[in-house]
Amino acid sequence: RIGIQICFDINWQDGWEALRKKGAEIIFWPSAFGGGQQVNTMAWQNKCCTVSSTKYGVSKICDVNGTEVAATGHWSEHWAIGPLNLEKAFLHTWPYVLRFPEIEKKYGRRIRIRNHHEEEWSIIESLSPDVRVADILDEFDLKTHEQHIASAESVQLKYRPF
């Protein structure tokens, strides 16, 4: 599923969140300006890929963690072409990191687990057409980052004094 935000929409997070909640895995953002790090930020904040297309300046493809997969520039190619693997899950690292050795032992080179140590994020990615990340999450009782935050928020709301 895809979503589209246009130009100045980059300044309103609620539109991006709404697209993600409706299942968008890639959000395209055509714009009159490049957006810079805002494009990368929208990717990691919403845990989905972003693809920008601008008349002038930099256009780019960003993965779910905000990493640029491909980009254009004033002095470079006018096309950004790069692979996006959508068979992955974005997780809060703790406590799921405790299960990573078991997952790696079972799936070996058919998966990749990347840890973003400072942010405490982890990404589990399938490298094989016969491995579905959703099945790994179910098998090892892992929650996506969104599910983890929703669970934590329900506890916060229960005990907040206001």
Model-predicted segments: where are they?
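Beta-strand-turn-beta hairpins that frame and shape the catalytic cleft
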Residues: R1-G3
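Active-site beta-loop-alpha junctions enriched in small/polar residues
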Residues: C7
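CN hydrolase (nitrilase-like) catalytic-core segments centered on the catalytic cysteine
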Residues: I10-I111
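A short C-terminal boundary segment appended to hydrolase-like catalytic domains
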Residues: A89-F162
